[in-house]
Structure formats: structure tokens, C-alpha cells
Regions:
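N-terminal module-boundary/linker segments of secreted carbohydrate-active enzymes
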Residues: 101-194, 454-473
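Substrate-binding cleft of secreted/luminal carbohydrate-active enzymes
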Residues: 141-148, 387-473
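Aromatic- and acid-rich polysaccharide-binding/catalytic face
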Residues: 172-174, 346-369
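Substrate-binding cleft of extracellular glycoside hydrolase catalytic domains
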Residues: 184-325
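Aromatic-lined carbohydrate-recognition surfaces of secreted/lumenal glycan-active proteins
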Residues: 144-146, 282-285, 313-344, 387-398, ...
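Loop/turn elements at helix/coil->beta-strand transitions in domains of secreted/extracellular proteins
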Residues: 41, 137-141, 167-170, 206-211, ...
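Solvent-exposed alpha-helical segments and adjacent loops
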Residues: 1-113
Length: 473
């Protein structure tokens, strides 16, 4: 290969160094390999920026799947793009040198890129029709899993699911408060994770996959003592009726931190909207349980606060509507009723039909395969006349096995099948069922492969046919 003389701002490309600090190391290595392959020029890596230019730097925080740029600033080359677009932009930038005539090429000009390769995704309306079709079709069920409560990316859960079952889930759940996407606390050097998450979601939805998001909102009360314990941010109480009124009143002391979190969450959901991704959004889940601060049950001191959740739900709904988040399907998903308090009832906090697109139950069994109380709760939400789902599904604490061998004796996917058999026999309808990560996951329970191979189960490979079916009708 004949080496061309490639100039950027008067400096030869071979004199540049690729800055490989932190998360950018992946991109720096990719750049060096690509340059060597395409031009025969070998670029050195550097752990830090040179003071006087000739750095190649990378910014993978772009939230638009197909967009990015190359900027020449103060003698440096800066590649900006998404997790998807950045490697492609690097190649396209270098292609100009390969395709240009002559032995000396000047690549100093900055350039904006729109690769125009964002996949065409289904619409929110089409998603709703698919769920309605499955809901009305006996013994047909969309299933999937929640991404675990760490900084795991969608691809991590998808790999685990495939390894356990030989197939991919048709629905995937994530949480803005617990999966590494807690925007208020995400440091700048990790914001590339947001771009990666968006791009992986786009790729998943392009195959027909369904994405759901919730949020374990942080307790906004100034006196709530938080510990280092995982998940502690969503516990405690905020007070009586006055505190709840202040929570939905702009500019109050308790409203400000909540609105700040809500704004950042809306920013992320807006990025999904801008990429064409419909989202099942289920805020304030399990509000009737009393274990999260976002509950009408506010402990012995304050008792039950009537209309706490309906008012908060409408506040979130109105704000997200103002933000133009028209890609959301709103799902009301209480816990299965488990107490004598009237506020434990699954319908107690229902905000009204005009604020809800579908409903669900978070259902954790303790080994009784009769339908029992959970079934009665499911019957209640079915009376609302909307698509109903097992929004979260898992086994209770006594059924958690320390190993897979131990789990075999406690709770397996065969038990899940038995529960579903009984539900369908009793006339229940279900749109989707989503297990809840880690040891509450289909992939943790033995016999997942047999479960996913059942005729009733729709996995990711079956989703395109469902969308085609509803488009034909």
C-alpha cells in the first residue's frame, strides 16, 4: 500500500496521537486499527492530551443513532457520534483520503454526518394493536425480562437470556433509577453509557422487541436519610396531605429535587422519542405496597393520603405531555393486593382512564400455585377494560435458590407454566409477562429453554410476524 501524505491543519496524520483515556480507549484503538488498515499509517496511543494539538479525541455521547461530526479544533481532530455512528464516521472520514486523487490530501475541513441508517421502527399505535391482539388471543403470550439493577446494558441481559434459553426475549424492561442511568448522579466520564443504551435499544426495537421503562424515583424529602444500601433512595415517606400538595406545586422545596429528576428522565425518554422508539412507561409502580415513598400509605405518623398517587401521576403525565413525549404508552402497575388497608387495593390509586393506556400487576408468588389473592387482584384490573399484563413476575423470597440445583427444588419455569395454565383456564387474559431480573428471572429458573419453546410463548423472533399481522388487518 502506497502511503499518502494526509494533512490536518497543516500537520501530517501520522504525527497525531489517539487519546486513549478512560472510556475512549475503545474508540482510540478502533481508530488506530482503522487508519492502519485503510491508509497504512500507524498512529500512536496516548494516555493524555498533548498541549499543542495533534490529538485525536473521541466523544461517544451523541444520543441520535445515526448522527455525528468531525471537528478540527485548535489543531486537534475530534470525532463525535453515538455508540453506533462513531466507528462508521471514523471510516467515512478516512475514506475521503483513500478516494481522493494525488499523493497529498488535506482533511482539515470539519464535517457533519447523518448516516440516515436509523432502522424503521414500529409505531406506538402498532405496538398497542399487537398487545391488544395477544391479549385477546387465548394462550398466546409475549415474555421477557428486566435488565438487572446495575450498570448493565441491554446487550448484557440479551446474552444471558440467549445462553439460558437459546432465544431472545420479546420484551425488555429497564429502570431509569436503578440500571446505571440515574442521570443526576452519572459522572461526565460515564455519559457515553447513555448513548450506548439508546443505540442498543434502537437495534433491539428494530427486530420487533418491546421496551418498557419505570423509575425508582429518589425520595425528595430533605430529611430523608439515605444510606449506601442499594435501592435505598426510593424508600421512606414524605409526609401528609400538605407535603403531597407541595410535591406537585412548582418551586416548593420538595418539588425542586423531584422536578429535577423528572426533567432528566424526560430528557432520556426524549432521546428515545427522537430515534423513533415507542416506550411502555410505567411510573409509580407498586404504589399500593407502602414500601416506596411514592405510596398513599405514609406510615403510622401520617396514615393514608387520599389522592396522593393520582395527583402525582397527573403531574408527571402533564409535564411529559408538555415535553412532547408522545412515544409513551402509560401503564398503571400496582402490586398484587397484600394487606387489609383500603389503600392496598389495586384500584385505590388509579388516576383515570384518560391517563392510562394499559394496566398490569407486579406479581410475586410464594409457591401457592392456586390463583388466590393475586388472581382476584388481576380480575380487578381486568375490569378496567384495558390490556392487562404481568408487568413484573417473580418468586417470593422463600423460593430463591442459592444455586441452580437448589432452585430446581423450589421454583422453575415449569411452575410458571402451571400458573399460566390455571390463569388461562380461569379465563384470564394477558398481554405480556416480564420477569424481574437476577433471581426473579426466567433465565435463573431451570427449564427456561423448554418454557421459551412452548407454542404459547412469543419470543423476539416471533414479533415481526405479529406486527405484519396487525398491519394486514
Amino acid at each position: 500500500m502506497t502511503e499518502k501524505k494526509i494533512l490536518i491543519a497543516g500537520t501530517e496524520l501520522k504525527s497525531f496521537k489517539a487519546v486513549a483515556n478512560g472510556a475512549n480507549r475503545e474508540w482510540a484503538l478502533h481508530f488506530c486499527r482503522t487508519v492502519a488498515k485503510m491508509t497504512g499509517i500507524y498512529i500512536e496511543l496516548s494516555e493524555s492530551e498533548a498541549l499543542f494539538g495533534a490529538n485525536v479525541m473521541f466523544d461517544a455521547t451523541e444520543m441520535m443513532y445515526s448522527k455525528g461530526s468531525v471537528k478540527i479544533e485548535r489543531g486537534n481532530i475530534i470525532f463525535r457520534g453515538s455508540y453506533h455512528s462513531l466507528p462508521i464516521i471514523i471510516e467515512k472520514y478516512l475514506e475521503k483520503a483513500i478516494e481522493a486523487d494525488g499523493d497529498e490530501i488535506d482533511l482539515t475541513e470539519s464535517e457533519e454526518f447523518d448516516l440516515c441508517d436509523t432502522p424503521k421502527l414500529y409505531t406506538k399505535e402498532e405496538l398497542m394493536k399487537v398487545l391488544e391482539y395477544v391479549y385477546e388471543t387465548p394462550d398466546l403470550l409475549i415474555v421477557g425480562d428486566e435488565v438487572d439493577n446495575s450498570r448493565s446494558m441491554p446487550s448484557s441481559m440479551l446474552r444471558k437470556y440467549f445462553d439460558a434459553s437459546g432465544t431472545y426475549p420479546a420484551i425488555m424492561g429497564m429502570d431509569l433509577g436503578r440500571c446505571g442511568l440515574k442521570l443526576p448522579t452519572l459522572p461526565d466520564n460515564e455519559r457515553h453509557l447513555l448513548s450506548r443504551c439508546v443505540c442498543e435499544i434502537v437495534d433491539y426495537v428494530a427486530q420487533g422487541g418491546i421496551i418498557t421503562f419505570g423509575c425508582h424515583f429518589t425520595n425528595p424529602h430533605k430529611d430523608y436519610e439515605r444510606s449506601a444500601a442499594a435501592g435505598n433512595q426510593d424508600r421512606g415517606h414524605i409526609g401528609g396531605a400538605d407535603a403531597w400538595k407541595d410535591l406537585v406545586t412548582e418551586g416548593t422545596e420538595i418539588n425542586k429535587p423531584f422536578k429535577r429528576e423528572l426533567t432528566l428522565d424526560a430528557d432520556f425518554l426524549s432521546a428515545l422519542r427522537d430515534n423513533g422508539v415507542p416506550v411502555i412507561w410505567r411510573p409509580l409502580h407498586e404504589m399500593n405496597g407502602g414500601w416506596f415513598w411514592f405510596s398513599p400509605i405514609q406510615g403510622e405518623e401520617y396514615g393514608v393520603v387520599k389522592n396522593a398517587i393520582p395527583d402525582l401521576w397527573k403531574y408527571i403525565y402533564n409535564y411529559f405531555t408538555e415535553r412532547g413525549l408522545d412515544n409513551l404508552l402509560w401503564e398503571y402497575s400496582p402490586n398484587n393486593s397484600n394487606g387489609a388497608n383500603p389503600a392496598n387495593d389495586v384500584l385505590y390509586s388509579y388516576p383515570g382512564d384518560e391517563y392510562v393506556d394499559m394496566v398490569g400487576i407486579d406479581w410475586y408468588t410464594v409457591g401457592n400455585y392456586e390463583i388466590g389473592g393475586s388472581g382476584r387482584s388481576y380480575e380487578k384490573i381486568m375490569t378496567l377494560g384495558k390490556v392487562a399484563n404481568l408487568a413484573e413476575f417473580g418468586q417470593g423470597g422463600p423460593l430463591h435458590g442459592a444455586t441452580r440445583d437448589a432452585q430446581e427444588k423450589l421454583f422453575t419455569c415449569k411452575h410458571v407454566d402451571a400458573i399460566l395454565d390455571r390463569m388461562y383456564a380461569d379465563g384470564y387474559k394477558i398481554g405480556y409477562a416480564m420477569s424481574y431480573a437476577e433471581r426473579n428471572s426466567f433465565v435463573w429458573w431451570p427449564h427456561c429453554d423448554e418454557f421459551m419453546a412452548s407454542d404459547r410463548i412469543v419470543d423476539l423472533s416471533g414479533m415481526p410476524a405479529l406486527f405484519e399481522k396487525i398491519r394486514e388487518n
